[in-house]
Amino acid sequence: MVAGVTRTFKGKIVGKDLTKWGKDAQLDFSAELAKAKASGAEGIFVFYPGKAGGAFIKQYAQAGLQGKIPLYSVFTVDSIALPKLQKANMSGVMGSVMTQFWAPDLDTPQNKKFVSGFKRKYGRYPSFYAAQSYDTIFLIKSAVEAVKGDLSNMDGMRAAMKTANFPSVRGKFSYGNNHFPIQNFYSRKVIKDSEGVWTTSVQEVVL
């Protein structure tokens, strides 16, 4: 993740720290946050899934950086982490930004149906993992229907799946010649919804 940012970021990177992972993972980020504060940086990017993410967000707020140096992350803040962060009242996450190919507030008929049904059944917002799974079922369904239920027609199944002729929660979706998805990526910001639940909202298309 860090290598990707380093390779593609158009601005100037004024500092980089790699912290310890594993059973004895580093959870004290005071030194790194102090360096970031002193560097004059206009943003902080992190990749901290799990408990390290919560620890970093808490210390980021305690260091007085919230509202001063924007926080950007990947696989750190999402619909899986946000309920836990809200329960722990880690408000330092509010206003932070991440990118993803899907968001719960994407304005498509299929996504509205998916999100409302998921919330009704589980009482929370779906994650992008759930969105992927939902899309996958409809993709497979489209292929099965294309071969009229003849699952032995593997070539027909593959050809049908390649067309991606299904209603995606992501909106416009197709495959390239290498079978990688062609899809939008969105900048998403952590907000409170109308009921006070922490979630993310699309800001703009970034890719």
Predicted regions and their residues:
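Extracellular/periplasmic periplasmic-binding protein-like sensory domains
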Residues: 57-134, 145-151, 190-194, 198-207
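Sec-exported extracytoplasmic/periplasmic mature domains
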Residues: 6-10, 34-41, 58-65, 119-123, ...
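Solvent-exposed, acidic/polar segments of extracytosolic/periplasmic ligand-binding ectodomains
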Residues: 162-207
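Short catalytic/ligand-gating loop segments at beta-alpha or beta-beta junctions
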Residues: 127-136, 157, 170-176
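Extracellular/periplasmic Venus flytrap/periplasmic-binding protein
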Residues: 1-63, 102-113
